[in-house]
């Protein structure tokens, strides 16, 4: 006996659009939570200073992550996706570097070595990793344009 259709027929492009939309939402959510966490923690790090305080750098990360989240959701262009990926990759890389390596003061950047894990830092790693994966998907899995026959 033939199986009954489970719903209306779908095109391959519908699935791709859904996955890209989900990736955009995940990227924006990860970047949005990253922005919130950095803004929330900034005051605690104002005392760690050189020329620039670590709190100021946290506020800068919060602003960049918020802008990246908006670009991924609203602008939806490769350049915006690239900016979002750079913010996510850069933020995650710096967090891990300063967690595991004591690089000291770098010019105006204070010594941000912090060899401990705590809830907000763990959450930041998770949301930044989600944003990295989602934005890399957006950059690498570009939709195909019409093919010449």
Task: List each language-model region with its residue ranges.
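Membrane-interface extramembranous regions
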Residues: 2-149
């Amino acid at each position: 006996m033939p199986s009954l259709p489970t719903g209306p027929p779908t095109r391959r492009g519908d699935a791709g659009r859904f996955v890209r939309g989900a990736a955009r939402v995940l990227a924006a959510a990860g970047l949005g939570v990253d922005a919130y966490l950095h803004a929330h923690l900034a005051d605690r790090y104002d005392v760690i200073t050189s020329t620039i305080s670590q709190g100021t750098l946290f506020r800068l990360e919060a602003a960049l992550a918020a802008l990246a989240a908006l670009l991924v959701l609203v602008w939806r262009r490769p350049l915006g996706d690239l900016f979002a990926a750079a913010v996510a990759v850069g933020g995650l890389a710096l967090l891990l570097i300063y967690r595991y390596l004591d690089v000291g003061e770098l010019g105006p950047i204070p010594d941000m070595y912090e060899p401990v894990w705590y809830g907000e830092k763990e959450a930041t790693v998770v949301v930044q990793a989600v944003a990295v994966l989602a934005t890399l998907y957006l950059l690498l899995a570009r939709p195909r344009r019409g093919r010449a026959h």
